[in-house]
Amino acid sequence: MIKIYDTMTRSLQDFIPLNEGKVNMYVCGPTVYNYIHIGNARSVVAFDTIRRYFEYCGYQVNYISNFTDVDDKIIKGAAEAGMDTKSFSDKFISAFMEDVAALGVKPATKNPRVIDYMDEIIDFVKVLVDKEFAYEANGDVYFRVSKSHHYAKLANKTLEDLEIGASGRVDGEGEIKENPLDFALWKSAKSGEVSWESPWGKGRPGWHIECSVMATEILGDTIDIHGGGADLEFPHHTNEIAQSEAKTGKTFANYWMHNGFVNVDNEKMSKSLGNFITVHDMLKSVDGQVIRFFLATQQYRKPVNFTEKAVHDAEVNLKYLKNTFNLPIQENANDEELEQFVKAFQGAMDDDFNTANGITVIFEMAKWINSGHYTSRVKETFAELLEIFGIVFQEEVLDADIESLIEQRQEARANRDFATADRIRDELAKQGIKLLDTKDGVRWTRD
């Protein structure tokens, strides 16, 4: 049985879906005002891998990941670029789709956009106002945190803890909010900004309400899994829970999953430190599969440390797996141990999707394959396990002239003409073909 570390309970929980054989997942997507950075990619890749493992286990997955296309940063960026907000966000949605495709990420079942759910957002806020979970003040609408009895349980905090922390804060909204912790559901329009008509005047939604509306509209009042980066635990996911459960009276999500950060040379990635790395730029020099494989080297909840060496190691290891995949089939080989590797891999992934341990099993399997156990059945299974990590290798086909050289070398060796055999081997090496003589015949890999 798959076990998931649930942030809400701070413990491993058996995964029991709402509907047998089906999984509903909602993962917070990007705010589309710039190219995604490697930290954003960690979340995308982690939850794509989790989705793929569910599908490998036979589940039908309804995977929803949104685009936040109404936001202060988008308004600011569009104004600086001299573009309207939709054209500006469209540009970075397209860039996002290109980047994640290069990382081998499967398309989501649906990528909802905030601008397509404005009526539903307004209706959601109206219900909260009617139930007195929210109040209007000067054209803004705020959620009344004091009515949410388990507010911030997800972040393992109490309302009292948060109120103490907020007591020294002063902001422009402080005078009109009942409580410093109350958060905006609807923001009144400012001059020159994009806005929509509402019962409280022209305005636009707050960030947190957007995900609650899209998740419940598409997946229903209660969903199986809600995921995102660890930075979203508070306040974003905390506020999603408060407003969603206030509206429906039901548990919003049964499992909360949060992925760890990406550090750069053991430092937090930030623009101020100058170590901010976008996937768009990284793809100019590093293959997308290498980036993805690097991100999978740690279990999704743990931080990943980005270094040039770590990426290089991922490239070398991926090349080894590719060369293993392209070994010649030996149908008469003994493959009885195959099920042991599959069982070990599933054990690793069932334990809260431990990709690090899963990859260890894959390398043990590759070593076993290289020792002469590569049947068609083994190759098919090897490919299935790699695909869970988004790794798909193409069959390597040698040019006819290279195949001819390999055959000529075999003839030279058979005739004990080792000088000719060595010359052909060196010639092939210059073309990137490395030969390995084994008791079962010659093998080749592309260097």
UniProtKB/Swiss-Prot annotation:
Give a GO biological-process term: cysteinyl-tRNA aminoacylation
The cofactor note reads: Binds 1 zinc ion per subunit.
Keywords, comma-separated and alphabetical: Aminoacyl-tRNA synthetase, ATP-binding, Cytoplasm, Ligase, Metal-binding, Nucleotide-binding, Protein biosynthesis, Zinc
Q: Which GO terms describe its molecular function?
A: ATP binding; cysteine-tRNA ligase activity; zinc ion binding
The record's InterPro entries line, in alphabetical order, gives: Cys-tRNA-ligase, Cys-tRNA-synt_Ia_DALR, Cys-tRNA/MSH_ligase, CysS_C, Rossmann-like_a/b/a_fold, tRNA-synt_1_cat_dom, tRNAsynth_Ia_anticodon-bd
What does the record give as EC number?
Answer: 6.1.1.16
Record-annotated residues binding Zn(2+)?
28, 211, 236, 240
Q: Where does ATP bind?
A: 271
Chief subcellular location equals: cytoplasm
Residue interval(s) of motif 'KMSKS' region: 268-272
**Which reaction(s) are listed as its catalytic activity?**
tRNA(Cys) + L-cysteine + ATP = L-cysteinyl-tRNA(Cys) + AMP + diphosphate
- GO cellular-component term (any): cytosol
Give the location in the cell.
Cytoplasm
Q: What class of enzyme is it?
A: ligase
Provide the family line. Answer: Belongs to the class-I aminoacyl-tRNA synthetase family.
Kindly state the subunit structure of this protein.
Monomer.
The name under which this protein is listed is Cysteine--tRNA ligase
Q: Could you tell me which species this protein originates from?
A: Streptococcus agalactiae serotype V (strain ATCC BAA-611 / 2603 V/R)
Which gene codes for it?
cysS
